[in-house]
A protein has these predicted regions:
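Transmembrane alpha-helix boundary and packing residues in multipass membrane permease domains
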Residues: 21, 25, 36-37, 73, ...
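Helix-terminus/linker motif at the lipid-water interface of multi-pass membrane proteins
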Residues: 26, 30-48, 117-126, 182-189, ...
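Small-residue-rich hydrophobic transmembrane alpha-helices
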Residues: 47-107, 146-165, 271-337, 369-393
Length: 450
């Protein structure tokens, strides 16, 4: 253990933690795009079904990811305080909670699968609904494995091991692409082939991450999984952190769906331009999001060690790093936008509109995005999750959703209204979270017993 005259993390240790997370986020996004492109070759009914069901999948994945992060915060703080015993106890409860919740969710949705699809999507073409039912069935089977992987990967990152989750994720993504090629093109299984391939890759992730948690060379080692029993005090702490974060992530997805329904009324040119802009905007933010995920581990361990000044220092340090990364990413994506729209075969009108929106994003995103997202990652690691949830939900519905709908439907703005709303959301969040950060009230939470 370092003495108090040294920083808890040196630059080499930060790179070792952050780079694998960034690579994992980037490759997962690129592989997801490739996966969608492969499924699109099956036909319009297939791609429509996958797109519809994926909107549910993303909602579930984000909620489970937030819950597992709640447990990882406990683990990282206990490890920071050199309390390996309670870190291991917390890790076991994270796995327990994630298995119970994901299995219950999967079972509920399996029982009410058809009514759920009809309620959520309403009247769609028969072929689309048939394909949706097939794809949704296999997606539901994968929920427990998503929960297990999210829990295991979060536990690994909490002990500064981000390399193993990256390797698992990369291998599983290539497995998914290979499985699609065999089952969709080789065996002609269509949507069912895509769903089975995804299920197999998720089972692989869960099995490998659970196996790797048995490594007794790591601070957290879990061996006898079937002997895990509920510890209600720890479960309560996990849920107190995880549930607000889960609600926050879920609300973002609902907001996206509301915006998507508004854009869908603007015509095919706007829809195509907005779809490509979404992909490119997501791409230029991935590296900074990876830094934010790593920041949660760093701040958690600092606070566990009782070094609040270090937590403040690293939030500032990694926010500056994120700003540099965002500027570089925005400029790179801006330079690649025209070649990408040409390779994608977009219509000239859609390509022109996409380039206009990316130009706007390149200008405004470096101004406020980092302050609106990166410090909150660190403050959540301190247990400041309710403030983050309330702020994020309010600014999203007030600015991102309401302003977008108002500008589109009242003033006749095109899809640029989405990004005006987004920028106003980022700016308001940045102001509120900056005030919160400098108030130091986020440091008053007690996630673990000292």
């Amino acid at each position: 253990m370092r003495d108090n005259t040294q920083h808890l993390y040196n630059n080499f240790e930060l790179r070792k933690l952050l780079i694998p997370i960034i690579v994992e986020q980037l490759l997962s996004s690129l592989m997801g795009t490739a996966d969608t492109m492969m499924v699109s070759n099956v036909g319009s009914a297939a791609i429509s079904a996958v797109s519809l069901v994926d909107s549910i999948n993303i909602l579930v994945i984000q909620a489970l990811s937030a819950l597992s992060a709640g447990g990882a915060i406990l683990c990282s703080q206990y490890l920071g305080s050199q309390n390996k015993k309670d870190a291991n106890r917390s890790a076991r409860q994270v796995l327990f909670v994630m298995v119970i919740l994901s299995v219950a969710l999967s079972a509920f949705c399996l029982i009410f699968r058809d009514p759920l699809l009809h309620v959520i999507f309403g009247k769609v073409e028969r072929d689309v609904m048939t394909n949706s039912q097939i794809y949704f069935f296999f997606a539901l089977l994968s929920f427990p494995f998503i929960g297990l992987y999210d829990a295991g990967a979060s536990i690994m990152r909490s002990q500064n091991n981000s390399r193993n989750p990256m390797i698992i994720s990369v291998i599983s993504n290539f497995m998914n692409i290979g499985g699609n090629a065999i089952l969709i093109f080789g065996l002609g299984m269509g949507v069912e082939g895509a769903a089975i391939s995804t299920l197999i890759s998720r089972i692989f992730c869960a099995v490998v991450v659970i196996w790797q948690l048995r490594n007794d060379n790591e601070p957290i080692c879990i061996r006898n999984y079937f002997a895990i029993r509920p510890d209600w005090d720890l479960i309560k702490r996990i849920l107190l952190i995880g549930i607000p974060s889960g609600i926050e992530n879920s609300m973002f997805q609902f907001g996206k769906l509301a915006i998507q329904s508004t854009v869908s009324t603007l015509g095919t040119v706007a829809i195509a331009a907005q779809a490509m802009t979404n992909i490119l905007e997501n791409l230029n933010g991935i590296a900074a999001i990876g830094i934010g995920i790593g920041l949660m581990t760093v701040v958690g361990q600092c606070l566990g060690a009782g070094r609040k000044d270090e937590a403040i220092y690293y939030i500032k340090k990694l926010s500056w790093l994120s700003e540099a990364v965002i500027i570089a990413s925005c400029l790179l994506v801006f330079a690649l936008t025209k070649p990408i729209t040409m390779l994608a075969g977009m219509e000239p009108a859609s390509a022109k509109l996409c380039f206009f929106m990316i130009t706007f994003i390149t200008i405004v995103k470096p101004v406020s995005w980092v302050l609106s997202f990166i410090p909150p990652y660190g403050m959540r690691a301190a247990g400041d999750v309710k403030f983050s949830m309330i702020t994020s939900c309010c600014t999203m519905w007030l600015c991102r959703v309401s302003l977008c709908i108002y500008l589109c439907r009242v003033w006749g703005f095109g899809p640029i209204a989405v990004w005006i709303g987004m920028f106003s959301d980022w700016t308001l969040r940045a102001i509120i979270f900056s005030i919160r950060f400098h108030s130091r009230k986020w440091l008053n939470h007690h996630v673990i017993d000292n």
